[in-house]
Amino acid sequence: IISHGKKFNLGLEAGSKPELHAVIAVNTDSDSLIVCNGYKDESYIELALLAQKMGKRIFLVVEKMNELKLIAKMAKQLNVQPNIGIRIKLASSGSGKWEESGGDASKFGLTSSELLEALDFMESKGLKDCLKLIHFHIGSQVTKIRRIKTALREASQFYVQLHAMGFKVEFVDIGGGLGVDYDGTRSSNSEGSVNYSIQEYVNDSISTLVDVSDKNGIPHPNIITESGRALTAHHSVLIFEVLETATLPEWDDEEVIAPDAHELVQELYGIWDSLNQNKMLEAWHDAQQIREEALDLFSHGIVDLKTRAQIERLYWSITREINQIAEGLKHAPDEFRGLSKLLADKYFCNFSLFQSLPDSWAIDQIFPIMPIQRLDEKPDRSATLQDITCDSDGKIANFISTRNVAHYLPVHSLKKTEPYYVAVFLVGAYQEILGDMHNLFGDTNAVHVSVNEKGYNIEQIIDGETVAEVLDYVQYNPKKLVRTLETWVTKSVKEGKISLEEGKEFLSNYRSGLYGYTYLE
């Protein structure tokens, strides 16, 4: 962001004290802006004001009234004229998942009454000329441009009113909200898309503020956006290997049932053997009834395990054939709509959903996902993706489709002789920083790649976290763990439970794993 944004004089926003420490150090261009949001204490404000005193263009945005009083106090102590911004709580709100981030229910911002109180306070403290910026935020990933335009109109009147009151505001920070078209629909009907382009967003933002300024004879403001999602989402791709698959059992076409097979098996075999389009609904109902009866008999010890397994294989074979027939029909019975989801394979993949795609788990965010090899082959399987955590929530079962949401991903059958990789796109916003170490899976390996006219360059390779690093985060000292194991192994050797060579091999494997990758290798 810093290197590529330098020619655009790109500024940075800090939403907390730790972020401010990072921003001050990396934003070396003294002419670019630093906007300070979030809750602030005296040390946060002092750090910002001292950085301003040394030449940084820092704006302290007041989120709550008490912050303004702290800014006035610290500015007087440090003998500096602060650049003050005020976050205004608009009545307008966004649309989509984060609609409640704006409007009257917003966590941050001053109401109209609080704004007047703040203006009176600044005037009484001789800080009237220090109010340089107003800010609003109506939520992330705003799906409808109409909501953005409504908020802009409302905010523009605050700009006009403040100028009329003698507060010469220079900047209007229109916050975040610029959305990303994750699912490709370019529609406000989906929370994973938006019904506008970046150009339309820019046109509306500028024209609204320019028009209202011209009508009231006041200067055009400098417009700031905090479009972090739109700026970063496209830069990152998550790639992982499929380790193995699991499919539902099926009956071998060449297999014939034994004459003494259980009557339920014989009945279900007859349904499978005579299945056709005309009889498929009746066959489906009969198959379900037989399966339920067989499971009940098994639970009471009347049917043995072999019979249960035969029932399962026949039942799922019938389900597959019915689904194949139904998919070819224009108007298939409603009962068959969920069969494709039910029949999907499970592809177990070398990643943690909670570490690398937390939004997929937490808010059902849908990302573009596809295999990245064998693209000249038609996929022959349908699958959901399972991660390697021990949590049943660690799966992706919703995918982008040309028709609403698909509950499986078209994939290829695995080949024993070659790996199979799947990629998840548009993961550059929020996913890495929100990642959770569920089951102690850490950060993944990362590669920084730049694209040019001749192709691409690998700029940097960053190793993922080791087991030792992750254990250290949760207060397990790796060296102490090794010492504990050494004591235990020595005791086991002395007691004759293992040989000396076996003990050495165990410790070698333990140390190697401790300082190795948290994912499967």
Regions found by a protein language model. Name each.
Residues I1-F171, L178-G184, N195-E200, T208:
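Active-site-proximal beta-alpha core segment in soluble small-molecule metabolic enzymes
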Residues N27, R146, R186-S188, V237, ...:
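Single-residue recognition of alpha-helix boundary sites
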Residues S92-G96, E170-N189, I224-I239:
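Flexible glycine/acidic-rich beta-alpha junction loops that bind and position SAM and/or redox cofactors
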Residues M122, L152, G179, S188-S190, ...:
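Alpha-helix termini
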